[in-house]
């Protein structure tokens, strides 16, 4: 049985540790995102800095929103340490349950996998909300997001972003989501 509460707690600890480690080196981190693989076998943290954003683009450029919000273009990525341990646990569970999670004839995910995926996503979202509470005093302007490649649609991403960030930032994110997603 997958321990979703342990998974959530470990994510919070990993995100906090990663953010504090990065903050020692970078004083202009503006967005931290939890990245989860579509097959639920790994997680990592990504972040971008104002300096990196300004090196890639400026607010007048057509591609500014792409560089501001597209995780794949960001400067910082962490999949080691606690994230690696969490990913190992995720991968082991997926491998042990492969016969239940994948239809052997179609190679498509099963309903059972979809249920597991929903619980994983819920745990990730709770972890990010908890992170918001725990780091708000030290990082009041830090934006947070959640990314699963080719899984969450624009509306779902914008809705979650709005649930953990300011109204102003959320409106900007939603207005430009087609430029980076």
Which residues does each PLM region occupy?
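Polybasic, proline/glycine-rich intrinsically disordered low-complexity segments
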Residues: 53-119
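Charge-rich, solvent-exposed alpha-helical interaction surfaces
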Residues: 10, 14, 18, 85, ...
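Alpha-helix initiation/capping motif
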Residues: 45-53, 70, 165-170
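Short glycine-rich, low-complexity/disordered patches
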Residues: 20-39, 99-153
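Short N-terminal edge-element motif at the start of the domain
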Residues: 1-29, 33
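N-terminal interaction modules that seed assembly of large macromolecular complexes
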Residues: 25-62
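Glycine-rich, aromatic-bearing surface loops/beta-hairpins
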Residues: 132-181
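Intrinsic-disorder-associated interaction segments
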Residues: 1-4, 8, 12, 75, ...
